[in-house]
Amino acid sequence: MKGRIFSVVGGMFLLTVCSKGDNSQVQAAPPGAELASAPTGSAAGGTITGKIKFTGTAPRNSAIDMSEEAVCKAKYSTPPTEEVVVAGPANALANVFVYVSAGVPAGQTFTAPATPVVLDQSGCRYHPHVFGVMVGQTVEIRNSDAVLHNIKAVAKKNRPFNVSQPSAGMKTPRTFTTPEVMVNLQCNVHGWMHSFVGVRPDPFFAVSGPDGSFSITGLPPGTYTIEAWHEKFGTQTATVTIAGTETKTANLTFAAR
C-alpha cells in the first residue's frame, strides 16, 4: 500500500509504512555482501541520498530445507533462510529498490550500459536478491551450482521467459525491453529461490545496501517523485526538489508490525 506523498525542498524527511509480521526468521545482511549497483547519471547533477530503516519487530524469514540438495547445503555453515527481510545494524533495511518514478525531463534519453549485470545462482539462491537494470541492458544469468536450475521471469509488461541451466558454469543473457517495477525471477526446481529486478528507462535508481544506505546521482535540477519498493513492506513515494548540484537527504523508515 502506498503512503502519503511528502514534498521536500531542503534538508531531511522521514517516511513511515506499516506491515504485518509473521513467525519466520530475520535474515541479517552478510558481512561484505555485494548488492547490484545502479548506473550513475551525470557527475555534474544533484544527488538524493539516504538510509532506510524499520521500526518495531521485523518479520522473521522462513528456514530453507536444502536436505535434498547436498551440493547447495554444503555451502552453508549455518542453516540458510529466505531473504525477505535483510536487517543490518541499527535496524537498517537492505534490498529496497529506490527509483525516480516521475520528474525526469521529457524527451531525455539514456544509453544503457554495455556492462552486463550478473545474476548468479549459488547455494541454491539468487545473488543479488534485488537489483536494477536499464531497458536494453544485458542481465547475465549464471549457474554456479552443480545442480539443475531454471530461471522463470514473471513479468506483466515484459515478455516472460523460462530457461534451464542444468550444469555449473552455464551463462544465459537476457534483456528487458519495457520499464517495469518489479519483475519476479523464480526457480521452478527450488521454490524458495526468488530475485526481483527493477527495469528502468534511466539510470536514476539504487538498491539499499546492508547498512540501509542508497544514493541516486546525476539528477538535473527539478522536482522528482521517488518511490521505494520492498517485497514485504510495500511502497512509499515522496517528492524531492533538486537545485544545481546539491545533495538532498531522504531517510525512509518502514514500520514492521
Show the residue positions of the predicted features.
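Extracytoplasmic copper-binding redox domains, predominantly the cupredoxin/blue-copper superfamily
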Residues: 18-257
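Sec-dependent bacterial lipoprotein signal peptides
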Residues: 1-16
